[in-house]
């Protein structure tokens, strides 16, 4: 599967963006998120999503994110999005000056499940590798783009 910016489509556009062959930059509007029915009893499906469709059943892609978080719940990550009720994301969510949460959210049939681990708030970039093997998906992360866990 080749990356081709002409195949990218917005589900929802951010406040501003710049797309190049080797880099995508975006600034989101405040209070945007992807989240569905869970313990917190609220639903959000208003975050910007830039997608590329594929019929491939076996693929992996790697993305490096760089971000500046300032307020609690600021997030930066990647998403595989089918519709508002079925998607998965990997992201870092800022909590405070001491720590933030590296996590994944899997949403299936409208219900989100969030798994996290705390990491230092000083981390301002993260590599993600998402892989699909038919109906199975794997999310991995890396600090250096070489060693993924």
Positions of predicted regions on the chain:
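Extracellular glycan-recognition regions
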Residues: 1-149
């Amino acid at each position: 599967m080749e990356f081709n910016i002409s195949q990218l489509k917005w589900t929802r556009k951010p406040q501003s963006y710049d797309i190049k062959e080797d880099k995508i930059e975006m600034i989101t509007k405040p209070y945007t998120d992807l989240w569905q029915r869970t313990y917190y009893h609220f639903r959000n499906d208003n975050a910007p999503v830039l997608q590329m469709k594929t019929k491939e059943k076996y693929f992996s892609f790697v993305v490096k994110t760089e971000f500046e978080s300032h307020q609690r719940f600021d997030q930066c990550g990647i998403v595989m999005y089918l519709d508002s009720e079925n998607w998965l994301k990997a992201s870092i969510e800022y909590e405070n000056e001491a720590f933030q949460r590296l996590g994944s959210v899997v949403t299936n049939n409208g219900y989100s499940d969030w798994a996290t681990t705390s990491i230092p708030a000083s981390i301002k970039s993260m590599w993600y590798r998402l892989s699909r093997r038919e109906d199975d998906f794997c999310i991995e992360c890396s600090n250096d783009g070489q060693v993924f866990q």
